[in-house]
Structures are given as C-alpha cells and as structure tokens.
C-alpha cells in the first residue's frame, strides 16, 4: 500500500480550537483502521501545521480520506 505525506496548515486559530477534538477523534479512527501511520504537529511554524503519513491505494482514496477530516469539512486546512 502506498504511503502519502500530507501537510496541514491551520491559519484559523479559533476554528482549530473549536474542531480539534473532532479531528483527533477522526485520526484515532484512521489509526485503528491502519490508515494513519504517523502524525503530529510541526513546531516552530508561524501558523499551526501538522504532518500526516497516510496509507491509501491511490490519490483518489487519499483525497477522500483527507476530505472526511473534520478540519477539511469545516474548511480549516
């Protein structure tokens, strides 16, 4: 299964705070499914940023996984 590295940028601090717990819940779901291989914040950046390593069969599947993230649903990444 191919691995993809995804970078999130969160310029909206208030939106991030409002939806971070839903995002974490989604990441836990992906982790349990073996889809999320690693993730974490990128400290030292001006905006909040994170990097995710996601296993997906192709780019279309990756796009669907990212689109289902509560941060994406709320247009925060």
Language model regions located:
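Conserved, structured core segments of small domains
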Residues: 1-77
């Amino acid at each position: 299964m191919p691995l993809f590295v995804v970078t999130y940028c969160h310029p909206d601090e208030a939106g991030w705070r409002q939806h971070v717990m839903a995002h974490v819940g989604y990441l836990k779901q992906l982790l349990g499914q073996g889809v999320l291989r690693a993730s974490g914040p990128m400290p030292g950046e001006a905006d909040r940023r994170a990097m995710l390593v996601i296993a997906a069969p192709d780019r279309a599947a990756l796009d669907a996984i990212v689109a289902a993230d509560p941060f994406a649903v709320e247009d925060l990444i």
